């Protein structure tokens, strides 16, 4: 009986030792698994450095997850990822999709960018009326393939990305809740007066890199609009009236040749105006066109100006390079030059004109005493 007990103990020890040797490398296998499933929450997304799109899109709260995702819920489309630790987000980007999959009702953030989607069929979002964020940029969507009421039922939608598609018309109707609308890099040719009707909560509108020739008075009712980007279009006239809350206006690379007198008076919060690469002449500008006390930066470079237009003394940065300016008039900056009256201008670019540094009047240092850079 004693010998039997000894043999039994030896067997158990051997078995335990073998099991230990077999499991001693468990941590290596664990690291391999972690390496293959780890998701870096700080990856640039959706615009990576290799991406052809130069404009960044602010990352939404749906990108704030970092742990390796557990198995996906059953109601997530098989073409997409639905991380359980952020259950209201659905990722279907960069998957060569040609159609929009089913959207579960709990979703608030859906990402369909960089696919081959050509249509947004009517009713595709009817099951998820609580959506806040829809990313559809970088697809092949055309205007005639968008359901008439596909967005109007989404009463909580705040951000809509439809840039880098094949749109020829403004989509609509759109929900009043919308705060950001990205329609840049399409082929839109005009903005009808009622195209943005009711969007009183819209704060940013991106329409750059289109083929827009006129916008009429479509911007007047956007009372919350802070940023308007209409650059790289075919505009010959500025919009008829600007929103009162506007702070940033981008109109560079158009064919604008005139700006009405006191045009910016209705936008007392306006800080930045870019009108470079247009067809502006002094005949197309009134005396008080740019005499806005709120303006901090004004870009009029690469136009056809022959004189420096009068600006407000509060202006800090003025870009006039690449024009035909042939004289330096100090009255454009200071109507009266003395110890108490001077311009707050810090940067003045006049290079690439028909003027020499010797043309600066003797009282220029007194008027432009705060300037840190004057390029002639």
Swiss-Prot record:
SMART domains: LRR_BAC, LRR_TYP, LRRNT
Disulphide connectivity of cysteines: 334-367
GO cellular component: extracellular region; extracellular space
Residues bearing carbohydrate: 127, 166, 201, 291, 341
A Pfam family assignment: LRRNT
Leader sequence residues: 1-18
Subcellular localization, as worded in the UniProt entry: Secreted, Extracellular space, Extracellular matrix
GO biological process: skin development
Residues in LRRNT domain copies: 67-105
SUPFAM superfamilies named among the record's database cross-references: L domain-like (SSF52058)
Maturation and modification: Binds keratan sulfate chains.
Residues recorded as bearing Pyrrolidone carboxylic acid in the entry: 19
Modified residues (Sulfotyrosine): 20, 38, 53, 55, 63, 65
Keywords: Disulfide bond, Extracellular matrix, Glycoprotein, Leucine-rich repeat, Proteoglycan, Pyrrolidone carboxylic acid, Repeat, Secreted, Signal, Sulfation
Source taxon at top rank: Eukaryota
LRR repeats: 106-127, 130-143, 156-176, 177-198, 201-222, 224-245, 246-266, 269-289, 294-315, 316-335, 344-367
Main location as per UniProt: secreted
Purpose of the protein: Affects the rate of fibrils formation. May have a primary role in collagen fibrillogenesis.
PANTHER family tied to this protein: AGAP008170-PA (PTHR45712), FIBROMODULIN (PTHR45712:SF4)
Family classification: Belongs to the small leucine-rich proteoglycan (SLRP) family. SLRP class II subfamily.
Oligomer status and interactors: Binds to type I and type II collagen.
Name of protein: Fibromodulin
Organism: Rattus norvegicus (Rat)
């Amino acid at each position: 009986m004693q010998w039997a007990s000894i043999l039994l103990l030896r067997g158990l020890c051997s078995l335990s030792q073998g099991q230990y040797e077999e499991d001693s490398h468990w941590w290596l296998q664990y690291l391999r698994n972690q390496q293959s499933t780890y998701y870096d929450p700080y990856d640039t997304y959706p615009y990576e450095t290799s991406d052809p799109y130069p404009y960044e899109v602010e990352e939404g709260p749906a990108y704030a997850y970092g742990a390796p995702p557990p198995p996906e819920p059953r109601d997530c489309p098989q073409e997409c990822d639905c991380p359980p630790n952020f259950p209201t987000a659905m990722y279907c980007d960069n998957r060569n999709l040609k159609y929009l999959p089913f959207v579960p009702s709990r979703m608030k953030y859906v990402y369909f960018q960089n696919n081959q989607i050509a249509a947004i069929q009517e009713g595709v979002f009817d099951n998820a009326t609580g959506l806040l964020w829809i990313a559809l940029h970088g697809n092949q969507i055309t205007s005639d393939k968008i359901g008439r009421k596909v967005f109007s039922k989404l009463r909580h939608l705040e951000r809509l990305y439809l840039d880098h598609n094949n749109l020829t018309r403004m989509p609509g109707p759109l929900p009043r809740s919308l705060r950001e609308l990205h329609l840049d890099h399409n082929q839109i040719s005009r903005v009808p007066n009622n195209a943005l009707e009711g969007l009183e909560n819209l704060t940013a509108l991106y329409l750059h890199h289109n083929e827009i020739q006129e916008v009429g008075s479509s911007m007047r009712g956007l009372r919350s609009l802070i940023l308007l980007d209409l650059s790289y279009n075919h505009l010959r006239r500025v919009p008829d009236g600007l929103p009162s809350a506007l702070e940033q206006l981008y109109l560079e690379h158009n064919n604008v040749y005139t700006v009405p007198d006191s045009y910016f008076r209705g936008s007392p919060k306006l800080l930045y105006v870019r009108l470079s690469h247009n067809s502006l002449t002094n005949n197309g500008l009134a005396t008080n066109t740019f005499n806005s006390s709120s303006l901090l930066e004004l870009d009029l470079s690469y136009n056809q100006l022959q004189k420096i237009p009068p600006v407000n003394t509060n202006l800090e940065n003025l870009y006039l390079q690449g024009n035909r300016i042939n004289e330096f008039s100090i009255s454009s900056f200071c109507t009266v030059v003395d110890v108490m009256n001077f311009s707050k201008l810090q940067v003045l670019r006049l290079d690439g004109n028909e003027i020499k540094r010797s043309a600066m009047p003797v009282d220029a240092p007194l008027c432009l005493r705060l300037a840190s850079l004057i390029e002639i």
